Structures are given as structure tokens and as C-alpha cells.
């Protein structure tokens, strides 16, 4: 599941990711919890085939009405758009993980009609790009901060950098 766009206030920014397995176990987050709960119910109740017809990606919007925004815990009338994608061998996740381990920036293009995925060299980060036919996401290594010395200042600097999703190395 990928957050592709948001309108108004949203708990998670575009590009946020979450995975759900058939047992309802999750990794990642796309909201403050209520949307995750609904997605888990859909996957477990209807099954992934019902959510993603014929194994193809599906687009969902939460918060279209004020009642729905309140029900799913979206602050201030926010709206969140998600793309749900069934994971299979053609998802190229091992290749994407390997590129990340090798600190290579990668662009992942998901064809929304067929579910086909292609990987290309890309930039480190960026917002997802959604069209009628494709979702393009950008993955890359985290920014790295190398801190020389292990005093109090280094500790505070490292904590701030970790909070900003930096990879921190203290020498």
C-alpha cells in the first residue's frame, strides 16, 4: 500500500508505505491507525483478490466526506489516496531491496492496468507520481551523517539526525 496523494491534513505524507499479509500483520503505516484497520479488514474479510481485482493494483480514497474523515481519524477533513498492490514475483521487491543495500537510487514504475513493475536508475527521493496508467515511486539510500567524536554534542546531533531518518555513523 502506497500513499500517493493527500489533500488537507494527513497523518502520513505521500510515499509512505505499508505491507499487509493474509494474517493481518503489517509493516509500515499509511495513517494514524484507522485506515490500516480498515485495510486489514478488507484483506482478511474479502480477500486480496476482491480488493485488487484479478491481481491488479487498486486505488482507494479515504476521507472523501466529513463523516468518513472522522471515522478514519483524518484530521481537519483531510483526504488520503492509496494504491494497493498485490505482491508477487513480478513486483521486483528483492531487486529493489538489493539496489537499496548497494546504496543505488531506484525509480519503480507500477503499471496500474497490468500490475507489471519495472525498475530504473532514479533519484534518491521524491514524491510519488500518479497518472491514469502508472505509479512511479522513488527509493534510495538514506542520507548519511558521519559524526567525529562521541561527546554530548555528538549524541544530541545523532538523535536529531536519526529523527530525520538519517543513517548515523559515529567515529
Predicted regions and their residues:
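Segments forming oxygen-rich coordination pockets for charged ligands
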Residues: 1-171
Amino acid at each position: 500500500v502506497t500513499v500517493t496523494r493527500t489533500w488537507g491534513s494527513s497523518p502520513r505524507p505521500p510515499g509512505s508505505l505499508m505491507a499487509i499479509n493474509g494474517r493481518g500483520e503489517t509493516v509500515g503505516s499509511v495513517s494514524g491507525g484507522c485506515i490500516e484497520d480498515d485495510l486489514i479488514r478488507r484483506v482478511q474479510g474479502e480477500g486480496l483478490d476482491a480488493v485488487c481485482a484479478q491481481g491488479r493494483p487498486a486505488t482507494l480514497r479515504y476521507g472523501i466526506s466529513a463523516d468518513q474523515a472522522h471515522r478514519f481519524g483524518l484530521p481537519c477533513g483531510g483526504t488520503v489516496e492509496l494504491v494497493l498492490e498485490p505482491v508477487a514475483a513480478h513486483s521486483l521487491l528483492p531487486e529493489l531491496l538489493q539496489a537499496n543495500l548497494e546504496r543505488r537510487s531506484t525509480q519503480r514504475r507500477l503499471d496500474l492496468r497490468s500490475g507489471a513493475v519495472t525498475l530504473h536508475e532514479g533519484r534518491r527521493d521524491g514524491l510519488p507520481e500518479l497518472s491514469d496508467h502508472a505509479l512511479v515511486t522513488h527509493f534510495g539510500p538514506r542520507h548519511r551523517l558521519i559524526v567525529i567524536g562521541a561527546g554530548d554534542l555528538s549524541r544530541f546531533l545523532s538523535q536529531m539526525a536519526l529523527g530525520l531518518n538519517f543513517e548515523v555513523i559515529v567515529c
